[in-house]
Structures are given as structure tokens and as C-alpha cells.
Curated annotation (Swiss-Prot):
A Pfam family matched in the record: H2O2_YaaD
GO CC annotations on file: cytosol
PANTHER family, A to Z: PEROXIDE STRESS RESISTANCE PROTEIN YAAA (PTHR30283:SF4), PEROXIDE STRESS RESPONSE PROTEIN YAAA (PTHR30283)
Annotated coiled-coil segments of the chain: none
Stated family: Belongs to the UPF0246 family.
Record protein name field: UPF0246 protein LBA1843
GO biological process assignments: response to hydroperoxide
Organism listed in the record: Lactobacillus acidophilus (strain ATCC 700396 / NCK56 / N2 / NCFM)
Length: 253
């Protein structure tokens, strides 16, 4: 069983907490993207990144200093978004760390797919970037079926804790031998059950930690997850779509 999550836009360096253990599986393809980005002018990169001046400056600095082989940070520590903060991998026990290295995969527009202890460097390249001037019109086309093939090489089931944008790297390539279970976290807003992005990211991070601590191997055991008072709702769930709902007051958290 594999678990997929999305990366975070905010990245940091951390070479002290845990050592790098592995090399990204698709590093050869990442070098192609690196070469393309470094061949672009500042104006072309501004168009590509479509970001604020501050973010563009940071991204240019990252790109100028990019080295895919040295001074690397384990992927699980390199991303510092909400999901990763609530996952809190720096507090994991060794069995939990071993569990995520084996089972957790971080999807990425730049690296394709990462194990938690793959060594990476900071980058900016969102999956939905319009790749003007590149050999492929989109990163979905560039990565094609590579990621799905790798995910399902040893496992028939993938737990999807990624965003809709990133699950598109996998969903088109499902078949009768490939099962993906999407987990959805909902709250009651204006008398309708909705997914609130920030709170869903918090819950996804907590669920990864729950799975690692409990060494979850059976998807059905995910139903025992209750952080933020989330409860599995069988009446609205299906075999491939697990829905959790809560009335937790996030404003007091």
C-alpha cells in the first residue's frame, strides 16, 4: 500500500535533523527540467512562475544556486506547508520513519515523485505550470505514466491524500489491477458538507502521522482516524472514496 501527498510551495533547507538516504527515482528527467529552467531569461521565468516579485526573486536565487547532487535536504523536511507541519515528521519514532520511507510518496512537478528521505534542493515548478518553450506542453504530459507505473509496481492500492491537481498524475492510469482510495475531509458550511482547504491539509498531515504510528497496512484501518473529531461516514463513502466529517471548531485550535 502506497500513500501519495502533494508537495508544498514553501521549502526550506535542513541538513541536520535527518540524513539523506536515497536518490530521487526520476532524477534524470529532473535534470532535463533543470536545464530548461536555467536556459530561460528572467522575463520568461516570470511568465512561467506567474508569481509576486518577492517570490520571483527567491526563485531566481534558488535556480542560480541549484545543485541536484550536493547540500541536499530530505524531501520530508524540505517542504514546510501546513500538511507537513501537522505531520511533524521530526517527532516520528524510528519505526514510523521507516514506515513512511517505504510507503509514503510525495508527488512533485519538478522531481516527479519522491520518497521521504530522497535528497532534494529547493525549487519552484508547480505541476500546472504552462511550459512555454519546453518540449512538452505540460508537466502532466512530461511525466506521463511514469509515476503511476512506479507506484503500482509493487502495490495494488494507493491511498490518495494529494490535491486534485497532483492526483491527476495517477488517476488517468488506473485500471482493474490498480486501485486508488481518495480520502476526503468535510465540514458543515452553510448547511452543506464541504472540504475546507486549510483544514483538509491539517487533517492529511495528521492522517499520515496516524498511519505511520499505527503502521497501517490495511486501508480499512484508516476508518479509525479521529483527529480533529473526524469520523468516517460509511453512508456517503464508497470502496474508493473514504469521507470523514467533523463539527470540530477549528477557530479555537
Amino acid at each position: 500500500m502506497k500513500i501519495i501527498i502533494a508537495p508544498a510551495k514553501i521549502m526550506k533547507l535542513d541538513r541536520d535533523s535527518f540524513p539523506v538516504q536515497s536518490t530521487p527515482e526520476f532524477l534524470k528527467k529532473t535534470r532535463i527540467l533543470e536545464k530548461f529552467l536555467k536556459s530561460r531569461t528572467r522575463d520568461q521565468l516570470e511568465t512561467l512562475w506567474h508569481a509576486s516579485d518577492k517570490v520571483v526573486e527567491q526563485s531566481l536565487f534558488q535556480l542560480k544556486n541549484m545543485d541536484l547532487d550536493t547540500n541536499l535536504t530530505p524531501a520530508i523536511l524540505a517542504f514546510s506547508g501546513i500538511q507537513y507541519q501537522y505531520m511533524a515528521p521530526d517527532l516520528f519514532t524510528q519505526p514510523a520513519l521507516d514506515y513512511i520511507q517505504k510507503n509514503l510518496r510525495i508527488l512533485s512537478g519538478f522531481y516527479g515523485m519522491l520518497r521521504p528521505f530522497d535528497g532534494i534542493c529547493p525549487y519552484r515548478l508547480e505541476l500546472n505550470t504552462k511550459m512555454v518553450g519546453f518540449r512538452d506542453y505540460s508537466l502532466y504530459h512530461f511525466w506521463d505514466e511514469d509515476i503511476a507505473n512506479s507506484l503500482f509496481k509493487e502495490d495494488q492500492v494507493v491511498i490518495n491524500l494529494a490535491s486534485k491537481q497532483y492526483m491527476r498524475l495517477v488517476k488517468p492510469y488506473l485500471n482493474s489491477a490498480r486501485r486508488m482510495i481518495t480520502v476526503d475531509f468535510q465540514e458543515l458550511k452553510n448547511d452543506k458538507w464541504k472540504t475546507v482547504g486549510v483544514h483538509a491539509k491539517m487533517a492529511r498531515g495528521e492522517m499520515v502521522r496516524f498511519m505511520a504510528e499505527k503502521q497501517i497496512k490495511n486501508p480499512a484501518d484508516l476508518r479509525d482516524f479521529h483527529d480533529f473529531d473526524f469520523q468516517f461516514v460509511p453512508e456517503v463513502s464508497s470502496d474508493d472514496h473514504y469521507i470523514f466529517r467533523t463539527d470540530f471548531d477549528f477557530t479555537r485550535h
